[in-house]
Amino acid sequence: MNHFQRNRFLFHLLYLMAPRVSEVSSHSMNSFRLYRGQWWWFVLGKGEKQGKIPASDEMLGALMQYREHLGLTPLPPEDDHSPLLRSISGGKGISANMVYRQVKTVVKEAAESIKLDNPIQASILEKASTHWFRHTSVTHGDDAGIDLKYLTRSARHEKIETTAIYQHAEDDLWHKAWQKLKF
């Protein structure tokens, strides 16, 4: 296995599923399951709380490509208890710390590649982390018009108020309106 394929899957997972880093490292392939004719990611998260998140076609495509690269069937059977993210050297899983370090390495390289042309974006990107992708996923979900109750369930937040923190559309409108004020 090479880093590219694992990283491609990892970044799809981080952005499209909004997981906590511990969820990324602790789950097996069969946590992606067909339920009532649709694919979901079944998660045991913070506080041992069970949750499920819809797996979009894009997420399934990334999962299938990653699994095929590993020499596995495109979609995981129920008995596939192998780690969701594998070490480069074989079938063992990787730790939450390794997931975090891998993300930091990739975003640092990406930031470095745009630094000359776009130093402000580079400095923002350099600060990205696994949790940043979780926040970004929920924020972009809100921007895309996904209902707050679905965002709350996908983020596995106890309270809808926690998820509401990620709603920035009002700030954007306010900022745009404020531009009308001229000296």
What are these regions (language model features)?
Residues 1-183:
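Conserved catalytic core of the tyrosine transesterase superfamily
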